């Protein structure tokens, strides 16, 4: 029996994928949402999302899924399964094979797969992420406001004067003092000093970090190479990310210059592969739930518009 043809295959059951599915519902278009149940950030609370601020992301996903399938809409299918393969066919359609071997076909494809975090090779970092190391101070940090001191890890993508200073000034809204840890990077320390030397609340520490130690709560103990330790209310660091595609494919997607997301043309996020859209974290430089929702909605508009003109051409 031939696989049914959906208007769109949506890969990813997070904020972007669910928002895209809702847009397709509104346009009375059929779609299937593949959700592997593996999500990037295992946090217990989502923030900066109106009406869902400080709510559990699991509860948000449940409510969004219910809205798609148990309310007024009946054109979206939820498939809680990982994919093994996605292939663009000569016809221009997309064919997906899931983990149990079932084949699905769609006229368009929305990737809402998120990203993978590349954990730095710093001892203890993985133990402290994400409970005590924050990549976004709009998503995290408010609950720890008023901390005596917090730290900024100026390593990896933050080993540059602009992001290191930027994150430090944002962190000062939440803490009395801030320490920038350059992890022995003399060149970076020299570049930072002229810009921050007048800030009494900001300290530059150029010693090498030996290890990060998690505590029973949020604070982190930073152990330096000379044997001294300092406890920080939390640490701030944005690690490198790469788009997540855990399946075989022939999509030939182009990466951004930074390699952190797919090239996706605004406003509807179509990739360099016609008919394939990348939305949410895998298609945006700024990665946050509220922006992923908006981006997913726009991707749905792009899909629906293309479908309408495809049908005109026939």
Curated annotation (Swiss-Prot):
Molecular functions per Gene Ontology: oxidoreductase activity
Q: What is its EC number?
A: 1.8.1.-
Q: Which GO terms describe its biological process?
A: cellular response to toxic substance
Give the required cofactors. FAD
Disulfide bridges in this chain: 136-139
Pfam assignment, any one: Pyr_redox_2
Is Coiled coil a UniProt keyword of this protein? no
* Cofactor binding remark: Binds 1 FAD per subunit.
The source's superkingdom equals Eukaryota
Positions bound to FAD: 13-16, 35-40, 47, 112, 281, 288-289
Q: In which pathway does it act?
A: Mycotoxin biosynthesis
Provide this UniProt record's keywords sorted from A to Z. Disulfide bond, FAD, Flavoprotein, Oxidoreductase
Please report which protein family the annotation says this sequence is part of: Belongs to the class-II pyridine nucleotide-disulfide oxidoreductase family.
Query: Quaternary form?
Result: Homodimer.
Q: What is this protein called?
A: Thioredoxin reductase aclD
- In which organism is this protein found? Aspergillus oryzae (strain ATCC 42149 / RIB 40)
Instruction: From the UniProt record, report the name of the gene that encodes this protein.
Output: aclD
């Amino acid at each position: 029996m031939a696989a049914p043809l959906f208007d769109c295959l949506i890969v990813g059951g997070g904020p972007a994928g669910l928002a895209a599915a809702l847009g397709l519902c509104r346009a009375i278009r059929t779609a299937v949402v593949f959700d592997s149940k593996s999500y990037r950030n295992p946090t217990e609370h989502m923030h900066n999302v109106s009406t869902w601020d400080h709510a559990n992301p699991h509860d948000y996903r449940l409510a969004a899924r219910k809205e798609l399938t148990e309310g007024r809409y009946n054109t979206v299918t939820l498939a809680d399964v990982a994919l093994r393969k996605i292939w663009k066919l000569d016809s221009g359609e997309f064919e997906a094979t899931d983990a149990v071997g079932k084949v699905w076909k769609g006229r368009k494809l929305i990737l809402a797969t998120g990203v993978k975090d590349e954990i730095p090779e710093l001892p203890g970092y993985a133990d402290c992420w994400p409970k005590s190391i924050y990549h976004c101070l709009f998503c995290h940090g408010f609950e720890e406001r008023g901390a005596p001191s917090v730290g900024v890890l100026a390593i990896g993508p933050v080993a540059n004067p602009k992001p290191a200073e930027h994150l430090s000034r944002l962190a000062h809204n939440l803490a009395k003092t801030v320490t920038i840890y350059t992890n022995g990077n003399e060149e970076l320390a020299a570049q930072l000093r002229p810009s921050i030397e007048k800030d009494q609340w900001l300290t530059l520490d150029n010693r090498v970090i030996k290890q990060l130690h998690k505590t029973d709560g949020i604070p982190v103990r930073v152990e330096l190479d000379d044997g001294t330790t300092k406890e920080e209310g939390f640490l701030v660091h944005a690690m490198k990310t790469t788009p997540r595609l855990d399946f075989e494919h022939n999509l030939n997607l182009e990466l951004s210059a930074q390699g952190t997301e797919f090239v996706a043309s605004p406003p509807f996020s179509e990739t360099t592969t016609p008919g394939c859209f990348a939305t949410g974290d895998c298609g945006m430089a700024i990665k946050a739930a509220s922006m992923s929702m908006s981006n997913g909605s726009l991707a749905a508009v792009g899909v629906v518009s293309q479908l309408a003109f495809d049908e005109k051409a026939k």
